[in-house]
Amino acid sequence: MQVILLDKVANLGSLGDQVNVKAGYARNFLVPKGKAVPATKKNVEYFEARRAELEAKLADVLAAANARAEKINALETVTIASKAGDEGKLFGSIGTRDIADAVTAAGVDVAKSEVRLPNGVLRTTGEHEVNFQVHSEVFAKVIINVVAE
């Protein structure tokens, strides 16, 4: 099925690309999420008329994401207190929700879906580097300092 992409889609293309995808992927994911429209003659003409507007909208979203990433990077370190044993092992773990709540409390709104933990949840005290994917192209880094209560 031919579709016109209205947004950047990973491993598929960017705004304005006409790509061939499986019908189920287009019907169940791309079209309902507003990431693509079927490539009919009417939609192609409509898209070409609105292309500049859509590109400007995408640029605004990217600029807003860059601004949020700068705010997150400006935090540098965030401290989270948790119960821990003698050797520095935590009772339980610190996951994406705990990190998102701590960063939000520090003054920058972050959703738990934006937190990236490449090594899994945090299970020890000390400093851990955590990445945030604010946008498909924009990343930020914060050092999380886990201390024992």
Swiss-Prot record:
Q: Which GO terms describe its molecular function?
A: rRNA binding; structural constituent of ribosome
One of its GO biological process terms is: translation
In terms of superkingdom, the source organism counts as: Bacteria
Pfam families in the record: Ribosomal_L9_C (PF03948), Ribosomal_L9_N (PF01281)
What cellular component GO annotations does this protein have? Answer: ribonucleoprotein complex; ribosome
What biological function has been recorded for the protein in this entry?
Answer: Binds to the 23S rRNA.
Name by which UniProt lists this protein: Large ribosomal subunit protein bL9
